[in-house]
Each structure stands twice: as C-alpha cells, then as structure tokens.
C-alpha cells in the first residue's frame, strides 16, 4: 500500500513540475513572439493589451493529440452529428431566418441545404460555438512544436484583425484550435472570406447575417458550384490499379477525366449523364460503411 501511495505522489509532483516548466517556457516564448508580431506591423499597444493575459492551456495540447475526425469511424462520426434533435433544430433555425437564408442563397448561389448542414455540424446552429479563450489556444499551439508555424501565422493574422478594429478581442471565445463563430472560421478564413453583410462596419461571426453570408462567400470563393455534381457511388472492377484509389478527400491524387475512369467502372453507362470532360477522383469508403 505504501508503494502505491509513493508512486502516485511522485507522479503528481512530476506532472506539476512539467506544467510549471511549460508555463515558464511559455512566458519566455511570448517575449520572443512579441518581436515577431511587431515585425509584422502589429502595434505594441494592441499586442500588450490582448496578449497580456494569454496562458498556456494544457488541455489544448490534449485535444490536439486526439481529434474525433481521425479516430472515429465514419458511421460513428456521422451518427453523432445527424440526430433527429439536430434535424429539428435546423428546421427551427430555417423557419426563424428564412428571409436571410433565401437572400444569401440567391446572392451567392450556394444551396441553403449545404449551408444549413455545415452550420449544424460546426456549432449545432449557433448554440455551441465553444468556450475556449482563442488567443490563449492559438498561443499555446504556436508555442507547441507539432504545428507551430501554422498556428503562429493564424495568431499573427488574428492580432492584425484586432489591430485594425475588424474584430473585438473580448468576443474571441471558440474552439480549442482557434476557430470562431457559427461556422468556426480560422483567422485566415476570416481575413480572406468573412464579410460585414449587415453593413454595421463590424464583422461579427456570432451574428446570423455576417456568419451565414460569410460562409456562403467562402464556398463561392473556393469554387463551389450550385447544383454541380459532387459525389456518386460507383462499383469498381477488380483490375483498377491501386494508385488511383484515394483513402481521403483531403488530398486527392491522380485526378483524371471521367472518360478515363469509365474503363474501371462497372455499368459505366450509368454515368453518361455527366460530362466526360469532368475531372474526377476515386475515394474508397471506410470499411464500416461498405
């Protein structure tokens, strides 16, 4: 019994020391990061104001190492995010914002069904936008070594947006990864695609008008075409070379014209309604949904 108590006592102090070291090193990192921020034309006044209270958040590192998108199979991931309760909440949101939703669909030519689905997945129609201090989250991930450069750039962009009075830093609470608002925009997405749709001289992504229109603007700018073909289920022949099979949509390799891939598809005539010149890629589904 004494050995067990001793073991946990040592473990407790060991973890405490690790956390203390991280906090000390984090404060040193902030001093160095300030020089980089100033070199990127962020005012010292803004930096000192918004970064003074940023803290190293140990939980952010834990969340970064375990993300459900990477560990849950497709069936589990989808079922958690497509409940009847969520569906009804989406219907309520549409009924309460019908005029805005229809205006945005017509202006940006993005299907309302797509936008509503994305909003449901990201924040359950604005009911859960996250409670993490985004500045501390981004600073923690910038200090961390795993994806430091990516999050450093995001933090610098966010500081610049604050410096230019485009965003109120006091409202910056969201996801552990630094995403913000009803559609969970990262700072670079805010910079490049967020818009002041209600023309109040302020971009508020926790406001339905700005958030919904910004999401539509983002999809339009990255090339989404309304009612254009996206995914179709096919059955492949056994002789297709494995190099043409993608296991993820994140990085599609070997894109070819549809006419090329038809030779490997059973019943290719079922795809005749699509233009043969379309560039396509093949994605294999997870084993759990085959």
Task: For every predicted segment, state its role.
Residues 54-56, 122-126, 236-238:
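Solvent-exposed loop/turn segments at secondary-structure junctions
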Residues 37, 77-216, 220:
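Acidic/His-rich structured neighborhood in mature extracellular/periplasmic domains
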Residues 16-20:
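Sec/Tat signal peptide C-region and signal peptidase I cleavage site
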Residues 1, 21-24:
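Basic/polar N-terminal segments that are highly enriched at the extreme N-terminus
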Residues 165, 169-290:
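Flexible, glycine-rich surface segments
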Residues 43, 110, 224-228:
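Intrinsically disordered or highly flexible coil/loop and linker segments, enriched in small
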